[in-house]
């Protein structure tokens, strides 16, 4: 997927500490978002920057930094951010949110993972399952 990313880089007086040098050999990450106004936000690499009004684009060395910046943006009521992985050959892959809905939100098509239709008090006694090889959360309903 060769998607071209567009947007302005936020105004930042510091540096990434050379973290993006590794991206020339391995990979880097980009986060894009739209801001209704110019405002200051905390950079995940340290320091503060001023985002521009409209479309913003920022390159970071790690996916975790993009996720951390996304949580900063959500505090500022900006929820339209997207995270991309950019490979050294220029190929771009959209990685977060994978199906367009954030993980903590309900999506009608999303499958439930490790869901048991019971209350915590209805879990089986762990002492009875101790050497059976079955975890309490995986045990069938009584």
Swiss-Prot record:
Keyword Mitochondrion set for record: no
Keywords annotated in UniProt: Photosynthesis, Photosystem I
Keyword set includes Protease: no
GO cellular component labels: photosystem I reaction center
Entry's Gene Ontology BP terms: photosynthesis
Residues annotated as signal peptide: none
Family per similarity comment: Belongs to the PsaD family.
Function: PsaD can form complexes with ferredoxin and ferredoxin-oxidoreductase in photosystem I (PS I) reaction center.
Protein name per Swiss-Prot or TrEMBL: Photosystem I reaction center subunit II
């Amino acid at each position: 997927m060769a998607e071209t990313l567009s947007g302005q880089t936020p105004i930042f007086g510091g540096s990434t500490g050379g973290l993006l040098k590794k991206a020339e050999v391995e990979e880097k990450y980009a986060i894009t978002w739209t801001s209704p106004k110019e405002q200051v936000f905390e950079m995940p690499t340290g320091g503060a920057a001023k985002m521009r009004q409209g479309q913003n684009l920022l390159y970071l060395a790690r996916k975790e930094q993009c996720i951390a910046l996304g949580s900063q943006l959500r505090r500022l009521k900006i929820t339209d951010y997207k995270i991309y992985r950019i490979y050294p050959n220029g190929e771009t892959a959209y990685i977060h949110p994978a199906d367009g809905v954030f993980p903590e939100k309900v999506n009608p098509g999303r499958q439930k993972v490790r869901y048991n239709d019971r209350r915590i008090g209805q879990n089986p006694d762990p002492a009875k399952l101790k050497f059976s090889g079955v975890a309490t959360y995986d045990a069938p309903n009584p």
